């Protein structure tokens, strides 16, 4: 698990990253800049329980690809979920809050992930445990904002102009961020590579 000091603002950006691409980098960097985060932990997951693992590359390969895509002092690629045998994001959040009680964690996700967030194991536990930053992705804006999770959490949504305050907000709290977008997707890249 990466080190963290009390008072730090750390974004948690989990995904299969199969493969990672510029769209992921834009989500992470938009959140980091707009929220004033000290670090973004790129949590390379052993596998998304809601996705087919048939074409999932080995975790070491995906972790190396994230390191190559997101070098620099603010990006921290990690596969600690695999080492701790964690399957669900809610368990990741619970572990991090126990290990680092003074750290201000923020869950980061692309808008495309928000559309299915209500299908995640214990999603409401995640939403009430830490603030959430949702970064716009092409083709997601209108459909995502009418999805289950944004409707259930609508009264806890911060205006985009208050994004920098999100890491210190008591959950549930979330913000929808707009910024540069990329049409690249992992599915498209796998298709182009014949996977």
Regions found by a protein language model. Name each.
Residues 1-195:
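Nucleotidyltransferase catalytic core that binds NTPs
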